[in-house]
């Protein structure tokens, strides 16, 4: 707990660079202290830390991934405690990065240290890769992996990044959605003017609203040409797994004060995990301050994230989006791509699923298996570039508030997360 508190207290905001190098140094120091061979690779924008321990050819080799960078702190007035002053309240540690992803990172190191202290050796060979740019689309990491495949040679990849479901059960995930993130900048005039001219001059705000309604209609259909062409539907085995999952909808809706929007003809989990999405992450135009101002807006900005499922090609969709906007007559729109992450998937019949399931059951009890999960992580780096089966176990709090004010991690989950990694290593060694 003290070690986690120490690295949470060290800012490591990848988007601004704040404290990232110092956090890297702190983690390297901790890794060396438990006996790992450690090498730092100064790739742009932030360093990758590679750790190794064990080289027994008769043992399996597990590559453990985590990231040490965090999201910006956001609105400080919304935090109950300072984000980089980790505070424990009633068994819960509050602070930026507690759950995403410094808690799991430290749990992995704790598990390695446990095996070495208790038994003098690990049941498997371990390689670790900790990056400092996950929250910035893992920039620079694909190129690093392509040129260091031998260094990272392993049998499988294991990591923990994410939360339990809303029934407080850990989630074992074998795949993730990809993401295409774009910014649409629509300009109608050189500057804002008095709204008295609304009858005769164009409004950027209204044009943006109209454009967005053409890209995705009220029934949820995305109208970018070819958007759904390459979608791989869930297999019958995957559908059977989804059908067995518990109903978490009531707890989910209650937690967020929301109501369901998914179509009645699709199951909740297939809609959540197996369907691509088109989301407005942010939209801005004109006057949004206190009080009133009568403004005819000259510029409108919308930030869009599209979550992609297996076989969808972000580059292809980006090209189609640009062409479609032009075809609709919006020559005044600039499309800025802020990043593309490929979807990734490990088949549910991988032999590594059973030992991970057994370990999770022994440590946490009831759990869920997701053939694919709804969020995005750089799993394609391991499945597509390194060609390795990849399994993730999400065990942080269901309401851990990742990316939001008051991010937190229940210490009992942190302790169990440590125990889980230690047990996963044991179960894999006995395959």
Predicted features by range, described:
Residues 166-167, 223-299, 307-320, 328, ...:
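An extended, acidic, His-containing surface patch that forms the Zn2+-binding/catalytic region
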Residues 101-175:
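Acidic/histidine-rich catalytic neighborhood of metal-dependent amide-processing enzymes
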Residues 171-187, 391-395:
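Flexible glycine/proline-rich, aromatic-decorated loop/lid segments
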Residues 1-76, 299:
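N-terminal helical capping/dimerization or prosegment-like subdomains
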Residues 69, 215-219, 322-331:
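A common structural junction motif
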Residues 59-130, 150, 416:
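Active-site metal-coordination/substrate-binding segment of hydrolases
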Residues 143, 198-220:
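A short core secondary-structure module
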